[in-house]
Amino acid sequence: MHILVVSVNYRTAPVEFREKLTFQAAELEQAMTTLQNQKSVLENVIVSTCNRTEVYAVVDQLHTGRYYIKKFLADWFQLEIEEVAPYLTIFEQDGAIDHLFRVTCGLDSMVVGETQILGQIKDSFLEAQQVKATGTIFNELFKQVITLAKRAHSETTIGESAMSVSYAAVELGKKIFGELTDCHVLILGAGKMGELALQNLYGSGARKVTVMNRTLSKAEIMAEKYMGHAKPLSELQCALLEADILISSTGASDYVITKEMMTKVEKMRSGRPLFMVDIAVPRDIDPAIDELEGSFLYDIDDLQGVVEANRAERLKEAEKIQFMIEEEIVVFKTWLSTLGVVPLISALRDKALAIQSETMESLERKIPTLSDRERKVISKHTKSIINQLLKDPILVAKEIAAEEGADEKLALFAKIFDLEMEDVESRAEEVEHKRAWTPSVPSL
């Protein structure tokens, strides 16, 4: 088995392409179910955010797995593989494990150290478990990753200087307008990104805030928390007339604000500039609006310059977290290496129990007067003897499994105990294809 990551992210793909490969939240479960039925794929978790779409998979063959995951992405988004391939980054084995740890800890984020990705990874993992797309390996790996990410943020100060993308948008607005107290701010979208932006705006002094959303009740709930006003999207054109700053993150599939709409609005704004930040993927605002004289549009990729400000301090903390990651990878790989010895141990236990069972049958034939209580006591004690005898050999087998040249040593181990290798290999296949669905996961 092999661990594989196929990624399209902000480092290698512009927003124009990333928005073509973005899974909507409502379709993630179906996507993971579909991928699970692809050739070579044994387990999978799909993570899709504004900055990345990544497929994490356990595959039986690397080459075949790579191909069918690429094909799945191309088919799902109705693209040709040739269109998708140039923007994909592939991580394999140790690189894939390290990448998952780094992403979940926020070290691979546009804003190093942000914590939003941890929640997104956890949500995707839980959804994958719900559709039984994860098995023995990912159930262990993702739990370990989530636990470490929580510890990394609690034991370092990386989160204190880190910014989310929505906070970066607010910082950009402050650089342009200075104080935000007198600015009229318009928020499009009442989801997580919109609320994060509003939290940061409120913390930066903004008090004239309007929240708009397709579902007005959601906008009202969010606006009430921060003493803002809520309006339906049907009044968008009027709201654009009043706004100084617009931050948009609706998750709509088409442009919410078109160039045609903004051209009409500009004529009525009497030359007042409008600062617009589009942090949605796919984008909410037609990029052609940036051509208009009074509109200043920034998308999610433009925020890179803002997030660089605190990078030096965050990188110091990131080094500490990377060390923690490397230690944790050793722990996971040790666990992973012992998976191969599980069938051997199982075969050893079964053989010992078979001997114990045969001995009990022989004893009962020779001493037919044994009472039920006496049989239970003898059976219990003979099993105890077996467990004591097997304890050290099993520990040694696990240690051998983590060493180089483990296959030859374990074969000798099997020979010493006269274990049938065909039986061991049969058990190994069962373990390899096992789908151990265990929904327990560390809470955030």
UniProtKB/Swiss-Prot annotation:
PROSITE patterns: GLUTR. During catalysis, the active site Cys acts as a nucleophile attacking the alpha-carbonyl group of tRNA-bound glutamate with the formation of a thioester intermediate between enzyme and glutamate, and the concomitant release of tRNA(Glu). The thioester intermediate is finally reduced by direct hydride transfer from NADPH, to form the product GSA. It comes from the Bacteria. It comes from Bacillus cereus (strain AH187). This is Glutamyl-tRNA reductase. The active site is at 50 (nucleophile). Substrate binds at residues 49-52, 109, 114-116, 120. It is an enzyme of class 1 (oxidoreductase).
